[in-house]
Regions:
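Non-catalytic cap/lid and distal C-terminal segments of serine-dependent acyl enzymes
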Residues: 1-191
Length: 191
């Protein structure tokens, strides 16, 4: 499994906000045989993460204009990082055993990866994906992408995160409908 925001994946002392996902503890506790390759983001003071993890250009009222370099990031994942992991670790490199996941901007990148490279990634977990970045471009990608059969996506948002944001709830519902209509095996939840 490939994961974005690697600093948040394993240990609390490395996590951006002091609380990690605890993936290593979970895998140990459940005795799950899974290799997790988690890459840290560029979490600099100038919001480089937004550039690194957005496949699209976008404008933000608070932070300004961003030239998304997410396509470059994902190309590196697919054409350099994954081959390195496959060559140096005992992986099963086929799409049936290759997953990708992340949250927020990493969730957006995970969704983008599944749509652009469903021949590489068979499953994705897009947790609280930043769909607001470029909803029109993402919707267009959902409509035109070539999907391998058996593509699986888990996508969710937190109920407190959504709160009273009717636009967020509506956008999530619309995106889920479009994804489901393409035949992706989708599990979508507000938790």
């Amino acid at each position: 499994m490939y994961m974005f925001d690697g600093q948040n994946v394993f240990f609390d002392e490395d996590a951006t906000y002091g609380k990690s996902w605890g993936v290593a503890d979970y895998l140990d506790y459940t005795d799950t045989p899974l290799i997790v390759a988690a890459v840290e983001c560029n979490a600099g003071a100038n919001n480089e993460r937004l550039v690194e993890y957005s496949p699209y250009r976008f404008d933000d009222k608070q932070y300004g204009h961003f030239d998304g370099k997410g396509k470059d990031t994902l190309n590196w994942f697919v054409h350099e990082f994954k081959p390195y992991i496959d060559a140096n670790y005992r992986t099963e490199p086929d799409r049936a055993h290759t997953f990708i996941g992340g949250s927020s901007m990493g969730g957006l990148m995970s969704l983008y990866a599944l749509l652009e490279y469903s021949d590489v990634f068979g499953r994705a977990a897009a947790l609280s994906p930043s769909l607001w970045v470029a909803p029109e471009a993402l919707t267009a990608l959902v409509g035109r992408c070539k999907l391998a059969p058996g593509t699986v996506l888990y996508m969710d948002y937190g109920s407190r995160e959504m709160g009273n944001h009717d636009g967020m709830r509506k956008g999530f519902g619309e995106m889920c409908s479009k994804i489901f209509a393409r035949g992706i095996n989708l599990t979508a939840r507000v938790v």
